Amino acid sequence: MTAQSPAPDLYPPVQQEIARLAALAEVRSAFAWFRAHESRLAEYQMEVARIAAPPFGEAARGAWLAGRFRESGLSDVDVDQAGNVFAVHPGYGSRYVALSAHIDTVFPAATPLNIRQQGTKLYGPGISDNGAGIVAMLAIAHALQAAHIPHALPFVFIGNVGEEGEGDLRGMRHVFATPRWNQAIAYSVVVDGAGSDTVVAEALGSRRFEMIVRGPGGHSWSDFGSPNPIIVLARAIDAFSRTPVPVLPKTTFNVGVIRGGTSVNSIPESASMRVDLRSTSMAEIDRLEGALRVALERAVKLENEAASLHTTRKPQAIQSEVVEIGNRPAGELATDARVFKVIRAVDAHLGNAAQVQRASTDANIPLSLGREAVAIGGGGSGGGAHTLQEWFDCNGRDLGLKRILLTMLALAGSGE
């Protein structure tokens, strides 16, 4: 699937349904609510951004969100064992349309959070990713309650943990691994960051490893010839970097972190590196993982053999360990999936130009399971994600919120 996927005019029945929904007095009232309460939404966004939520440290932010869900009038507010926060807007069916946004950030707990507003712009770490997504959920919840919009399938709102970095999508994994929600969620709409110009309908797969090498260590002069963990990693990187990768399916690898050693005249006792493998094909990721493991095994063997030639005493052998620190499955939404038709028809109705993209988001989990899911932005615009200079511009937020609301209502079906 690409940005040149079938045009929305191939889905006239869906477009007609979107036009009907948008003309309802209740929906127009919800649209008006978005505009009238922008200042309140901006306050919510700054409030949540001031609560640190590093990976595996989201509890305080989760408690805040549970309180806001209750305040909005949603029912069945709950926090599961993983820390995911749930709330329900009732309907008439047994299956749900899920609206989710991750509540974690990439920033450590001690990061200075200088959250502030200048005009229509909000500034500070996490203000857009994923302050914008969290506030979009709250806006939809409040507007549904205020406008009394009927819909058939109920909505479940999920503030999930563990999307960023080493969180490895743990929150969404837990949602789809639990009997309560595994089969109950019919459609998933993930709100991640700012903007209204993308539709993530293709999940980028990735696998990450930490490779650790340990040896006896020693002095660079008196223990010369003892096996060196850093040299092992250098050999492994050199060999692995020669692994061919295809242009299609697009496949990449990266050695992003190397650690080891204490001084220039010390043979290190240990060294490690972190490697990131990505592809649109899980088979290619499997192939790269195999090549990476072979490269390390051969490098260890070569260094142990070399060490035995440089000393008269039997050297202590190098040992290696490979630890998987991330595994995000790939997946792709079919172009005839209802959620894809709906979001494209919504964009056509709103005159919104959005491109279909591939990315790594919480939608990876349902997509990898063959479920219908997309990830979209919460409106407005943003930049500087994952930096202290992150920003969000509230201008255009209402377009993103209209987009989310119409998509949710169309997926849920009429409650009339």
Label each region the model flagged:
Residues 107, 149-150, 200-206, 264-269, ...:
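Short glycine/proline-enriched loop/turn "hinge" motifs that connect secondary-structure elements
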Residues 113-126, 214-217, 385-386:
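Glycine/charged-rich beta-loop-alpha catalytic/anionic-binding loops adjacent to active sites
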Residues 103-117, 202-212, 345:
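Acidic-glycine-rich active-site phosphate/pyrophosphate-binding loop
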Residues 126, 130-204, 246, 412, ...:
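Acidic/histidine-rich catalytic neighborhood of metal-dependent amide-processing enzymes
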